[in-house]
Amino acid sequence: LPGDLETYGNLTGWELLTYFANIRGGVDWHYTETLAERFALDLSRTIRVLSKGNKQKVGLVQAFMHRPELLILDEPTNGLDPLMQQEFYRMAREATTEGRTVFLSSHALAEVERIADRVGIIREGQIVLEEEVVALKAKALRQLEIHFAEPVSTKAFRELPGVRGVFADNSILHCTIEGSVDALIKIASQFEVVNITSHEPDLLQD
């Protein structure tokens, strides 16, 4: 599915899907109708009168309707409202649960983080990084706030590897950490800890 779908504007949604179904073959029309219903899509309307979002829905139905083993989608939620984006996410997860592969291109990193198991980052036409999302986030910086019962010295925390930006605000210690928090927690456990707040990293930080 291309990012900007351009197709036969004089056909209705049903006619367009029938055209592609005849090329591909083996389409389950009940499943196709279900996809259209999930997107609240009226397939009786002519393509040229549809909004950008509805054209995108037609494209998504066309991409999913024959249950391909590999889906290649470029900016698939382009033009979709938030509710329809959520529906697409569910459909993508269903496909992967069934053992099919979804290859997704997107500039919306929150969307990639929500759907993908692995992520590749392309810069100037070259893949500069490819890794599982969980592993990538584990390497990212996270913000920690440790609330102590009373003020503590920051010296021991400043000396820990991977820990930076350490400062205290009364009895609250703030820091940024890369990687494991084990060493930090061991130091903190020497004092009376009231609460720990962790601001988890997202892909936008990487």
Language-model regions, residue ranges each:
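Short active-site oxyanion
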Residues: L17, Q143, I172, V193-V194
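Structural motif
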Residues: P68, P161-R164, F191-E192
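ABC transporter nucleotide-binding domains
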Residues: L1-R123, I127-L129
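ABC transporter nucleotide-binding domain
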Residues: F88-T176
